[in-house]
């Protein structure tokens, strides 16, 4: 068996492990509608997924009065909480995580979600025990700042050079680059394949099964 390139695999959550992209887009649009603000189109709303909630609201609606951003965040939370218990993991995620853990990898999540939201989602999906550590945007800097990866590697005593970030957005890949970690993209989430390819990930998976196979063969 070939020597592993990585010891530590860090996953984004929304759009990478959980099938939540479309729901997040609809909740951003519903929040804007509630406040009678211009409703962002689906592409604009999807682009900000992965950022902290505050940064996402500013990025998706840069031309509105800043006083609306906290209200947008509140309305977004309202709509998301109505739906989040229905959100599934992508097919194959549970099996992939189980297999990777059995192979001896350290596993973590780095997400733009808040701590309460991530814990609720992970408990609902019954995967909390599969991860060695997690980091949320309300605990440190938002992506693409490298802090999440820096803190996770420090917490688990891992080497950044042997750390792999897996995500569906350019925010994930930029965070990895900023931290000095390698990255793999997934094309089934929020950002399109062309945008992801521009950041030269080691691999770009079209689905979880391709991702699982690549990690098994190459990571």
Where are these regions (language model features)?
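Short, acidic loop-to-helix structural element flanking the phosphoryl-transfer center
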Residues: 82-109, 115-119, 146
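Alpha-helical elements of Rossmann-like donor-binding domains used by nucleotide-donor carbohydrate transfer enzymes
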Residues: 26-30, 55, 59, 75, ...
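Hydrophobic alpha-helical segments typical of transmembrane helices
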Residues: 27, 41-44, 52, 56, ...
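Asp-based, Mg2+/Mn2+-dependent phosphohydrolase catalytic module
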Residues: 2-9, 101, 114-115, 119-219
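Short helix-capping segments at alpha-helix termini
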Residues: 33-38, 64-67, 102-103, 126-130, ...
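A metal-dependent, Asp-based hydrolase signature
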Residues: 49-81, 91-94, 99-101
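Active-site neighborhood of HAD-like aspartate-dependent phosphohydrolases
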Residues: 2-47
């Amino acid at each position: 068996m070939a020597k592993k390139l990585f010891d530590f695999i860090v996953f984004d959550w929304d759009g990478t492990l959980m099938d939540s992209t479309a729901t997040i887009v609809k909740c951003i649009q519903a929040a804007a509608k509630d406040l009678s603000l211009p409703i962002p189109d689906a592409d604009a709303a999807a682009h900000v997924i992965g950022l902290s909630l505050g940064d996402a609201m500013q990025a998706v609606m840069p031309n509105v009065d800043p006083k609306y951003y906290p209200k947008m965040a509140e309305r977004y939370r309202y709509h998301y909480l109505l739906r989040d218990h229905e959100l599934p993991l992508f097919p194959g995620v549970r099996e992939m995580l189980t297999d990777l853990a059995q192979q001896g990898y350290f596993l973590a999540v780095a997400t733009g979600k808040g701590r309460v939201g991530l814990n609720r989602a992970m408990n609902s999906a019954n995967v909390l025990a599969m991860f060695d550590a997690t980091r949320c945007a309300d605990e440190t800097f938002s992506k693409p700042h490298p802090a999440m990866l820096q803190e996770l590697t420090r917490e688990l005593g891992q080497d950044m050079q042997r750390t792999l970030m897996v995500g569906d957005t350019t925010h994930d890949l930029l965070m990895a680059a900023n931290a000095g970690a390698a990255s793999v993209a997934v094309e089934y989430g929020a950002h399109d394949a062309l945008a992801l390819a521009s950041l030269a990930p080691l691999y770009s998976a079209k689905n979880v099964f391709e991702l699982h196979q690549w990690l098994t063969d190459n990571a």
